[in-house]
Amino acid sequence: MFSNSYLVYISETNLIHMTNEILAKSPSQGGILLTDHTKMVLNLGYSLAKNYPSYNDETLKELMVALILHDIGKCSKHYQDYMKKDVELDSEDLESPIKFNGPYHNSISWAFAIVCLNGVRPSIFKPYKHFPLLSSVLYHHTVKDDETLRAGDIITSIGEGDITVMKEFYMEMCKYVKDIFGIDILSSHDYTLVDEPSEIGYPLSDEKLFIDKKNCKTPGEYFNFTAISFIDRSILNYADRVVSSREYDNERILVNDVDYISSIHNDRLTRIPFKEDFSKYTDKKRLDIQIDTINKCFDNKEINTNVICASAGFGKTLMGLITYMKYQKKTLWVLPTLSLCESTYKSVIDELETLNASDQVSVGLFYSNEFKKGDVNSDIIIIGIDALLGRLSKNNLTPLLLDALNANVIFDEFHEFLMNEPLFAGFINLLKTRKDYTLANTFLLSATPLDFKNLWGNSHIKYWEDMPIYGGDIEVEIHYKEETTLDDMSFSFPENSITILPTVDAAQYAYINTPIETKLIHARYLPEDKKNHLDTVFNIYGKKSTVKYKTPIIGTNIIGTGFNISTRTINDYIITPMRTIQTIGRGSRFGEYSRVIYNVISSNMKADTGIRKLIESCACMSMRTQWVELLKDYDGKVITKNELYTIYNDFMKKYTKEWNMYISDCFKNSTDNLTKIRYVSGNYKKSDDDKLNRGYTYRGESTNFYATVPLDDGTYMDPIVCDINIRFKDDTDPKDRYYFMLSGLFNFPSKNELKYRWKIKKNYEATFDNCLGLARSKDCPLLLSNFNYKKDIGLYRRDL
């Protein structure tokens, strides 16, 4: 489209004319000019930025530069040549890749900022001075270029003429920003253009998605850069997608119709109040406390983050709905696991029915990168924490990214977010951003809440710690037992009991070897079977259960926290301070029993690595040991729930120093691991929807794969997601892994046998990694010949 040699000498007048012919989208996608597209993104972005009190003159100016630069790479000749072909992209996927020779436009835009602006390049003295700008520009799409490409190489590869056009485009947009918004970008030396681009050896791989805390001078600097980058990226991505989607009146956006633009994002958040009906709630005293607490939260305008320390059974679901009613604002309801998402969705639907409000409030359910119920416009969206944090690092469903920072958010059972993996740091950074940099309201619900004072103090946050213990007079009869192996299990499985075991294998072993009828629940089922088992648990032990004989339930920690179920007897193999309080909440949760039996089983962790790994992932080991010893002293005694909570609170006060140190260590490890998350993907295909993540995720290194097993009827099980540790221990001999892969060749369909044979090499580790990579696709499952599958047991070892 452009002659590079000619453009170097083209007159300024003609150059401006050329910038007005540059396309942002092909004709089939609307044929919008890049100048118009960028102006609309600027208009939307500026309107959004006014909702954040954290923006000052400098940070707002940097945001405007990012909005100008995000698509400037489309000025390149190879991109415009592609536009001329008018190749229609997948209309359902705005992330469809541009297939052409040369760097992708987001990489070019990023490189232009580093090479062609005077003060944006990162330095060893100020590595994150302009991190929000560079990160937002690069990651407004996934990075598809070779990560070894350097900024200088990218600019050199596209030609001097292209750079000239980009510079003119940049100057034109800077003038627009000054004329319309009164922001003089060029008054800051950092954002002025260099005379001649220099060779800069700064590679794409150095532009992390998340900041490395070690390069920040203070925790405050780390949180500030992280928060601004979150907000900048959300504004840029959302504004870009709104304009590109053509769902709104782009002509009104282009002329900067302020009222119309404001309505686009404000209407997403504002909700019409519904008429509640509390007549079916018989516990008026508890209801009054719930309503009064939320009213006090609403009236205190200086606090936007409230931690509700309510015991199990106190009605946190109803409190969440009262919050929605009071604030009349779109709400994200965030849970730690997929099972809890399903459970909470059911609880919210049930509560809305009790309130006679089912037809007034829409409820969505989102996890595994898709809506299972409702859609992005639902009034309340139940969402997993992984899926919510994924919006900070992925570019699909950008309205949810904006909601993550602007909607009301309820973090339910948030104590479960504490871990050494990136999820905890992601949660803390998001919470800190919402607390100090936005006007949005956040509610955190837990019977065993984390105390954040050690991380950032008490500003803008209130702990509601005087909530009465629900069912505090209910008696708890404690029994203590030590066991070395699963064969030592001495507690029976009486009617109306749940048994919580540390691993799936342990739960399956107990189920198989128990002579009486029991029900089993864990995570290793096919989706439909898992749903049926969860429904069974709720039908037997749920709030609306009419079942007289309650079949014993055997399961994993999937049922120990958050489930709205009630039982009379609990056999607990997972002993930590927090989990004891959480688990005892399943005992007489609905107040139907005056006494519950709590059987504490302390397993030999040296003999059972599964238990040790689980405990280490969620508790301070020294505190866990002391807690077990404390419970041992109550063997055979009867205390009330009130007394148990007092014991727990006194214990946590005694070990405050150790607990704060543990939280700090978790945060440090988590922030270190957060920098490992990078979304560098290849070309998107619809067939990729079921592919499992590679590399590092918010839960750590991804070792999941699809597996299948031969069934007794001669068929094969539908592919199921497994962790590689189901088959291998950490010290497994590489040769064993190799032969496993050979024996696991599975013609499903036939083309995949060729894939595996092509990948198999003499290098055992390479073979393992290659086959595991293939097995991340649902149509290439690995065969687990030593496993079987049954609907009641799930995927289990044949030698169990």
Model segments located where?
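N-terminal accessory nucleic-acid engagement/regulatory domains that precede
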Residues: F2-E12, S123-I272, K778
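Conserved helicase ATPase core of P-loop NTP-dependent helicases/translocases
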Residues: L526-T556
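Walker A/P-loop
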Residues: K301-T323
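SF2 helicase catalytic motif II
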Residues: A387-L388, L397-K432
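Inter-Walker segment of RecA-like/P-loop motor cores
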Residues: T354-S393
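Interdomain hinge/linker at the junction between the two RecA-like core domains of SF2 helicases
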Residues: T448-F493
